[in-house]
Amino acid sequence: MAEVAETPSVEAQEEVAQPAEAQVLEAKNGDAKKDPAPAAEEAAGGFTKQERAIIRQVEYYFGDANLNRDKFLREQIGKNEDGWVPLSVLVTFKRLASLSTDLSEIVAALNKSEEGLVEISEDKLSLRRHPERPIPEHNEERRKEIQERTAYAKGFPLDSQISELLDFAANYDKVVNLTMRKHYDKPTKSYKFKGSIFLTFETKDQAKAFLEQEKIVYKERELLRKWQVDYLKEKQEEYAQKNEKRKNKKEAKPEPAFELPKNAIVVFEGAPETSSREEIREAFEKIKDFEVAYIEFAKGETKGSVRLTEADAAEKYIAKVEEGKLKFKDEVSLSLRKATEEEEKEFIDKAIEFMKKRRDFTRNKGKRFNRKRHGGNDHKHGGGKKARGD
């Protein structure tokens, strides 16, 4: 029977983020609409539609794909020395509960299964995975083996239900896992079906037979089909191209250059060692029609530089000061002169370097703020328990 995986899987991010590597995507079950009432008569093989759905769902719970990631169910299995899980626990799982909560009905359906995966206890109140069917170790080798027998199919209506897709999968021998691929829709804050699925077959030959069929039509739509490994490789290449294009675009757009006015630096000497930068500014700003942009001066020194905001302002400023002497305080005057070309170049280079560092710091600070704002440290968010999706 097919194992069911209807999911907001990690691949739901693919529209906006680049995967680190091609990977077999894990999934969790979500809510499902209740299937229509089963037909009274038995279908081919002696199963009603309701029985098939119950068997399919329970065997999914105990199947390889689900047990490898379902921590809650593994915990329930571990509570009993022999691995029995009470049916009363299983019927709390949303999808099984949507089919039936009648324990006798579930047991009766499972008694008809020929898979031999699930065993029923003598009192008919508990189930377990058959001891002769141990869970395969989930490692890199196993991941690749699963990927090699998984197909990708696209073209399903966006409003498709999991039950409809399972009915579709039942036509092919033999699908053991079906993943509905979804994306997160921001306006509705919900996961929506993308119209494509992954089908994992029991063997690679079965997957190959599905892919090699000349044409498969679902509800008058021809499906696009390919190996999952090929699909993931194409996506990786697509992401790499997008990133390269984005990188090239960024490199093609140079950072705006910092330009400072020329001939705007006045060098002063004769300041008392106790002078502060604020006092220097106050003295320079007494000369009207000139604006101070930056002062390079450290307390304890007697010499420094003042950059004015406009080009060619240095000579004009000095011309307004009597004999090149700027009154400071306590009858102290500062001797002024225009900076030499070498001094000006050194001053401007240092100023531009400082401005670049400040710009980079501000930009990185903004990025850090946005990461925190949008949940960059996911492990620190959400103190409550995560609801179990079954």
Curated annotation (Swiss-Prot):
- Where Phosphothreonine occurs, the residues are 7
The chain's disulfide connectivity reads: none
Where do the record's region annotations for Disordered lie? 26-46, 362-390
* Domain named HTH La-type RNA-binding: residues: 44-137
An example of a GO molecular function for this protein is: 5S rRNA primary transcript binding
Q: Which SMART domains match?
A: LA, RRM
Biased composition, Basic residues: where in the chain?
362-374
**Would I find Protease among this entry's keywords?**
no
Phosphoserine is found on 9
- Classification via Gene3D superfamilies: 3.30.70.330, Winged helix-like DNA-binding domain superfamily/Winged helix DNA-binding domain
Q: What is one GO cellular-component annotation here? A: cytoplasmic stress granule
Q: Where is each xRRM domain found?
A: 259-386
Q: Name one GO biological process term.
A: tRNA processing
Key words of the record = DNA-binding, Nucleus, Phosphoprotein, RNA-binding
Q: Where is the RRM domain?
A: 149-234
| Chief location bin | nucleus
Where located? Nucleus
Q: Write out the biased-composition intervals (Basic and acidic residues).
A: 375-390
Q: What does this protein do?
A: May be involved in transcription termination by RNA polymerase III. Binds RNA and DNA. Binds to precursors of RNA polymerase III transcripts. May play a specialized role during fly development.
Q: What is this protein called?
A: La protein homolog
- The organism encoding this protein is Drosophila melanogaster (Fruit fly)
